[in-house]
Design a protein with these regions (language model features):
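N-terminal binding-site loop/beta-alpha segment at the start of enzyme catalytic domains
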Residues: 2-80, 133, 201, 282-283
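Alpha-helical scaffolding within the catalytic cores
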Residues: 15-20, 68, 99-102, 154-157, ...
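Short, acidic/polar
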Residues: 39-50, 92-107, 154-156, 178-179
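A structural motif
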Residues: 55, 109-112, 143, 167
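A short, structured active-site edge motif that brings together acidic residues
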Residues: 78-91, 113-120, 174
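Beta/alpha (TIM)-barrel catalytic core signal, keyed to glycine-rich beta->alpha loops juxtaposed to Asp/Glu
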Residues: 88, 120-285
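CE4/NodB-like, metal-dependent polysaccharide N-deacetylase domain
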Residues: 96-117, 136-140, 161-162
Length: 285
């Protein structure tokens, strides 16, 4: 899944915008704008700012309670890659179908570019039926692509084995101090794009001495260094930011490249026990 380059002439930081090939034949913008913890009232302006800077992928979720604001921020931009997620309480075939319609209503859209199952919730054991609903929603044109979030190897293999349909992507916690190498390797084998939530490690990575040193070497913001590391590993990070300064600092990841030595130094920060968020094997929401 090599990154491809597409020209996007938007914003003050106009640049080549890389994309990743999805297994359904579509292209995914490689750097996204996350909206976790952005209030409904603040979402329109934050999203408008991100689009003005140049982002072409916007991520939200039903549980974020800001889909209406995100939809307003996207406005009439028909070519923005918009994705949302179905929350845990909506799992199950019929509940998922209804929840997806509600997401579309809040977003003001008749479809989304990507629809994700937010968590597997293995104790509920409804994610296979939810995935079957996703397949039907894609067939109805309500989701152009379908994927999952926080799925483990056993979860991925089960939905593939039971439905024959492989998710286009799996959005997981991933940052320099929690690199999920085994799961990434599985994604490569299965043709699944790895999308990354909390790609900056909730800000901890920005304060890391190695990251700070590379930021000084490159003359780029520390956040951009981390996001560039993600991108050179063919990952799709979706950092959240609310101020224009931070949004632009993150977007600077498209303006430079890291050397092999710099990449290796960041690779060395990995900690298999460095998870910040919930363990998908235990989390039921």
């Amino acid at each position: 899944m090599a990154a491809q380059i597409r020209w996007y002439g938007k914003g003050d930081l106009m640049t080549d915008y890389p994309t990743l090939a999805l297994n359904d034949g579509r292209q995914l913008p490689q750097l996204g704008f996350g909206t976790y913890k952005i209030d409904e009232g603040d979402a329109p302006e934050a999203v408008k700012t991100a689009l003005d800077v140049g982002y072409w992928l916007v991520d939200t979720a039903a549980i974020y309670q800001n889909e209406r604001g995100v939809g307003k921020g996207v406005g009439d931009w028909s070519d923005i890659f918009l994705q949302t997620k179905i929350w845990n309480e909506s799992q199950g075939f019929e509940r998922t179908k209804k929840a997806a319609d509600k997401c579309l209503e809040r977003l003001g859209r008749d479809h989304v570019d990507m629809l994700l199952i937010h968590w597997p919730c293995p104790e509920k054991d409804l994610f296979v039926e939810t995935w079957k609903a996703f397949i039907e929603l894609r067939g109805e044109g309500k989701a152009k692509s379908i994927g999952v979030s926080n799925f483990r190897e056993q979860d991925l293999r089960r939905i593939i084995d039971e439905t024959g349909v492989t998710p286009a992507l799996n959005q997981i916690e991933l940052h320099p101090t929690f690199q999920q190498r085994e799961l990434r390797k599985l994604h490569e084998e299965l043709g699944i794009v790895t999308q990354c939530w909390s790609p900056l490690g909730q800000g901890a990575g920005i304060e890391n001495e190695t990251i700070a040193a590379i930021a000084e070497e490159t003359g780029q913001p520390a956040s951009a260094v981390i996001l560039r590391w993600h991108m050179q590993h063919r990952l799709c990070p979706i950092p959240k930011a609310s101020s224009r300064d931070h949004i632009e600092a993150n977007f600077a990841a498209l303006k430079f490249t890291l050397t092999d030595d710099q990449m290796a130094r960041i690779d060395a920060l990995d900690d298999p026990e460095g998870r910040i968020g919930p363990d998908p094997g235990d989390f039921e929401g």
